[in-house]
Amino acid sequence: WTVYHYAKEKGMEICRQKYGKFVCDILDYIVKGGHPNLFLHDNGLLYSNGKERVISWMNAVVDGRPVNPRSGYLVEFNGLWYNGLRFAAALFAEDKEMASKVEQWNAIADKTAESFVHTFLNDYGYLVDYVDGAMSDWSVRPNMLIALSLDYSPLDKRQRKRALEVVTRELLTPKGIRTLSPKSYGYNPTYVGSQTEREYAYHQGPARPWLMGAYADAYLKIFGISGVSFLERMLIGFEDEMSQTCIGSISELFDGTSHSLNHDYWTLAGELYQRWFRN
C-alpha cells in the first residue's frame, strides 16, 4: 500500500527502480510459503491462524488470548493481497524480463478476485469480517473499509457502493468509524472500567478517527469530486478536537456515541493521512 502511493506520487519508473525488487521479494516470499502465518490457498486467498494470538490491528488481549480471535480469511488481508498483486503486475508491465512473473501475479489475482467476492460478499451487500472453514463472522466491522478503499478492488463499483452504504449507515459517526455496528452482537460503545473491561470494549464499538482516511478514499472512489463537500463536513469537526484533550492532536478513540479518549499512534497515522488528503 505504501509503495503504491509512492508510485502515484513519484511515478512507476522511479518506484520500480527504488522499490521494485522489494515488492517482488515480498510477493515471492508469500507465494513460496515463506511467511509463517500467511498461507496462499489454491483459491488465491490468504489464510492466517489467529485463534491463539492476535494477527490484525484488532489486537486486544485478555489473559494472553485474543478478545477478537479473527482467523482464517481476513477481509482486509485479502483486499490488500489483491491490491498488491495487481500493483506489482502494473509496476513491471513494461519489463520484458519480468513477463513470466507478471503473468503469474495476474493469474493469482484472477483467482483471488473470484474467491474474494464468493467468500466475503453477503446477500445484505456488505463484506463479512472473516471466514474460517464453515464459520463466517457477519459482524459489521470497519475492516471491510480497507478493502473498499484500495485502487485495485475485486469488487465492481455497484458492489463497493452498496457495502459503503452499510458502513455509512451503521459505522460512521462525527468522530470517526465505529469498530462494531450497534446492530452486531457484543456492541459496547464505551471504553471504561477496569483494564480487562476496557480490553473487551476496545474494538467492540468505540469510534476510531484514523479509519476516516480509508472511508474518505472509499467514498471518493464511488462519488468522485461530488463527494468532497460531504467529506469536508465530516472532517471539519476534528479541528476543534485539536485544541481540546490532546492539544495539537486527535484522540485515539471516542465513544461510539462520542467522548474523546487518549491519544495514540493510530490517530497520528490517521492525521497524516487526512493532511495528505486535504492537500
Give residue spans per PLM region:
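Aromatic-rich carbohydrate-recognition surfaces in CAZymes
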Residues: 1-55, 74-78, 82, 206-220, ...
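Catalytic cores of carbohydrate-active enzymes
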Residues: 31, 35-41, 80-191, 233-270, ...
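Short, solvent-exposed segments of well-ordered alpha helices
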Residues: 68-76, 131-138, 199-206
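Generic long, charged, amphipathic alpha-helical segments
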Residues: 177-212
